[in-house]
Every structure is written in C-alpha cells, then in structure tokens.
Amino acid sequence: MTNPKTDPEILAFFTPDAVQICESEAPVSEWPIRMWCRATGDHNPVYQDRDAARRYGHTDVFAPPGMMHAFTMPGLLDPTHDHLLSHLRRKLAEYGLNSTVMGKYEQEFITPIRLGDRLTREVRFESMSDEKATGIGIGHFIPLVEKIVNQNGEVIGNQRMEVLFFRPGTGKPMDPAAKPAKAAPAEVRPPGTVELPPLSIPLTTTLIIAGAVASNDYEPFHHDRDAAHAQGMKDIFMNVLTSCGFAARYATDWAGPAAVIKGHSTRLMASNFPGDMMTFTGTSEAPFQKGKETKINLRCTNSLGTHLQSVFTIV
C-alpha cells in the first residue's frame, strides 16, 4: 500500500470518534506568563500588573491570548506518550512522511485566560489532502480543529492548524543564482489606512529556543540541530506559537494596552532560522479606537522572503 489515504488505520483518525483531550498540567499562573512575555519582548503591562489592567479598562490581568495553546501543550514527555497526534505521526512515518511544518494557523479568542484557570483542549483531525508538491517537500496537508475551554466549561477560544506532513529531502532546493522576483506594484491603500512602524528583531539560537520553551513546545527540531537536519531543515527554526506571539506583540505595541486581540488568521512561509533578522510591517484599516473592531494586516520578512502574513482583529 503506497497511498496513506487508502490505509484504514489512517482513515480512522478522521472519524467523529477520533478525539484527543489535552488537559493543562497546572493552573494558569504568573510565571509562565512572565516567561512568554520575556521570550517575545512583550512589555504590555495588562498581562502582569493588576493596577495597569484596570487602568486600561480591563477587569483584571489576563494571559496573552495566544497562550491558550501553550497551556495545553503536552510539554516534555516520553516519546511513547499516548497522544492521538503521536499515533498519526507514527502511521504516516511508515509512508516516509516523518517531517512536519505548519502552513496555516488561525485562532479565535472568546474568553480571557485568568490566573487559576485550568484549560482543556479538544483536538480533532479534519481531513487529509491529496499529495502536494511544495517547496519544502512532497506530502499531505492535515488540518487540526481544536476547542479550548476552562474549568467552568466556558469556551476560551477555537483554533485551526493546517500541518504539512512531508518526506524530507523532496523539496525544491533554493537556487542561489536565481534572479530575485520583481517588486510588486505599489499598493493602493484606501483613505484612512494607518501604516505601523516597522519592528526588526535579530534571530538568535537562544531566542528561538526560549520561545519554544516558553510556549511549552518540545518538538526536537525547535531545539536540536541534529533533529532539524533529520527533518531536512538547515538549522533549528522558530515555532509558530513564538512567531504569532511576536505578531501579537507588534499589534498591541501599536494599538496600546487597552486593545484586546480577538483573533488572527496567519499563513506561515519561509522559516525563521538563527543568524537572520525578522522585520514586521503592517497597516491598519483605521486608527485604533477602544471598543471598535479594527483589522491589522501584518507581514514578517526575513532574508529568505516572507515568514508570515497575518490579519489580526482587535477591539
């Protein structure tokens, strides 16, 4: 059998009964919030200072919304840990699909994450694409659909992740002699569009590892060069939670501490490797006003091209 889409054991992962429940190992507390903010350089006071949170119109401190994923990550576990995603990975590895990379990441934030909350994440696999040839490798896209709730049953948020499972070494190598693409024509922006000041951040090995640890992500290829090389990557690379954590910081640095992020839709492209520089730029459809929904279009680039493109919604 050469097509994983015809394997009954793999098809079983896409049935209504195939659900993974991931519970946070501990209540939400100040320390992981502080570690996340340090890793992403997010100095927004509403995440750690109760007086500041109330001064800016919030009822209390709350965790950065993107942490809803981090709090329910399995953390550093034995490789044989019984997790639905681990089972799927092992089955796909039988077909040579033993490398993964995130293609798209969408989050909707509904209820603030408070100190003391215990979060639970419900994970389902949506579907499996036909085989695709991408720049990084040949494989299949599999979306994961997830809901996060707190101990009271309140929905904290929803997220959807599109993951590429691919065969390492099957991508299209970059041609160093290739001519750079022609610059796109100048964008015509509607009246009232606000341009955000650029933000450039050096990419170091320490930063990439710190972000992965702060987001409770112990995928080896974010910390271990040998594991990254085995995946077909030139070095360790930044995980999606860190990338989106920086994007969220960029949005609220501009909008200010009164802003609340309600969600984002992000497409991931060129990886962030150590020794490079990432630069955020963006535009808003209008100046931010507290209580009024505003959309921010963000772009992050590095020397390889576009790292991510996002639309963030804030109120």
Regions flagged by a language model, labelled:
Residues 95-97, 144, 256, 269, ...:
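A signal for specific C-terminal beta-sheet/loop modules enriched in small/flexible residues
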Residues 67-68, 106, 160, 210, ...:
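Generic structural signal for residues positioned in beta-strands
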Residues 234-235, 242-287, 303:
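Catalytic-pocket segment enriched in acidic/His residues
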Residues 1-21, 102-200, 272-315:
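HotDog/MaoC-like acyl-thioester-processing domains
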